[in-house]
Swiss-Prot record:
GO terms for molecular function: metal ion binding; ribonucleoside-diphosphate reductase activity, thioredoxin disulfide as acceptor. One of its GO terms (biological process) is pyrimidine deoxyribonucleoside triphosphate biosynthetic process. This is Ribonucleoside-diphosphate reductase small chain. It comes from Schizosaccharomyces pombe (strain 972 / ATCC 24843) (Fission yeast). It is an enzyme of class 1 (oxidoreductase).
């Protein structure tokens, strides 16, 4: 995309926007709220909007009181390690390194052409179209905002490694689309999904508005991007695990396991960083962000799943998204909002957050030998965001 398209993502701060959906499925509009509309707490008492209240939005001056954010003259030197939990996340990520060249797609085209029907191909290609753009959006936030805002070197190491692995995810998804979709115009339409597919454009708009917002605190934007990686990705991961359950598309499903593990680690890390903040937004503020992300994700699956498939439909997927959202809310210190069960039996033993058994399993030998040996094994803490067990 050339520079002439940049105005597509100049998000209005005061007013939301209707995103048109233009496809053979028909035309409809998805409304993406402005940040002001998200936090429309006009009927709430002033007391509840103060720090400690459920509707506290935070203040920019709070950040000068945050150890992880205030100017740190020692940020250029890594040792001695002061934040061992954060450093452990970096070492886990480092030990999990992989490349797109390790994914074998040689058997996938046979399944794509002969074992998936047209509705299933539409569903999976829509999922991949979102994924192909989403990692670039996550990286823009890391490059433009989080990496420069956070002042402790341990966290900067995590963000730096995340930028690299998100590039590998983006390369992998682009490679998958390039392999499966062979008609040139259709292929380009999927690569341009944040401009051509309304529900994907809405997800992109929602994420990009937080990057562009100069008023929201780091804490609020941390919750928003935990939602991007923990909610906007979760249903799409589940859709590919659904193929794995059926024994289809081994290259796609293997890459999905690796990427799901990585993104789970990123979501866990967001929750850990949130726990390190002294001035956190109120519970209702966190809830408003998560619930809004869920609503947009449900709109997305209305488009991605226009018909019911075997063991997969829009209603089940929407319930699964609510289930995962509750787990994220709890990991951020909130109560559950939806109180629903996991509708997918094939996701019972999968964590979206790098749960220890999933991390150690590594699908094969994807933990680089020796990387973890120099660090103390972190004990399981209260910030692990799982999608299978009840609290």
């Amino acid at each position: 995309m050339g520079l002439e398209h940049l105005e597509e993502f100049s998000y209005p701060k005061e007013h939301g926007e209707e995103v048109e959906y233009d496809s053979e499925q028909g035309v409809r509009k998805i409304y993406v709220k402005s940040i002001k509309e998200t936090f429309n707490f006009d009927n709430v008492s002033e007391e509840e909007k103060q720090e400690g209240g459920d509707y506290y939005l935070g203040k920019k001056e709070d950040e000068l009181d945050e150890v992880v954010l205030r100017p740190n003259p020692h940020r250029f030197v890594l040792f001695p390690i002061k934040y061992h939990e954060i450093w452990q996340f970096y070492k886990k990520a480092e030990a999990s390194f992989w490349t797109a060249e390790e994914i074998d797609l040689s058997k996938d085209l046979v399944d794509w052409d002969n074992k998936l029907n047209a509705d299933e191909r539409y569903f999976i290609s829509t999922v991949l179209a979102y994924f192909a753009a989403s990692d670039g959006i996550v990286n823009e936030n890391l490059l433009e905002r989080f990496s420069s805002e956070v002042q402790i070197p341990e966290a900067r190491c995590v963000y730096g490694f995340q930028i690299m692995i998100e590039n590998i995810h983006s390369e992998t998804y682009s490679l998958l689309l390039d392999t499966y979709i062979r008609e040139p115009k259709e292929k380009q339409r999927h690569f341009d999904a944040i401009l051509t597919m309304g529900s994907i454009k809405a997800k992109a708009k929602w994420a990009l508005r937080w990057i562009n917002d100069e008023d929201s605190t780091y804490a609020i934007r941390l919750v928003a991007f935990a939602a991007v990686e923990g909610i906007f990705f979760s249903g799409s991961f589940a859709s590919i695990f659904w193929l794995k359950k059926r024994g289809l598309m081994p290259g796609l499903t293997f890459s999905n396991e690796l990427i799901c593990r990585d993104e789970g680690l990123h979501t866990d890390f967001a929750c850990l960083m949130f726990s390190h903040l002294k001035h956190r937004p109120g519970r209702k503020v966190v809830e408003a962000i998560i619930v809004e992300a869920v609503d947009i994700e449900k709109e997305y699956f209305t488009d991605a799943l226009p018909v019911s498939l075997l063991g997969m439909n829009k209603d089940l997927m929407c319930q699964y998204i609510e289930f995962v959202a509750d787990r994220l809310l709890v990991a951020l210190g909130n109560d559950k909002y939806y109180n629903v069960t996991n509708p997918f039996d094939f996701m019972e033993n999968i964590s979206l957050a790098g749960k220890t058994n999933f991390f150690e399993k590594k699908v094969s030998d994807y933990q680089i030998a020796g990387v973890m040996s120099g660090t103390k094994r972190a004990e399981k803490d209260d910030h692990t965001f799982t999608i299978d067990e009840d609290f």
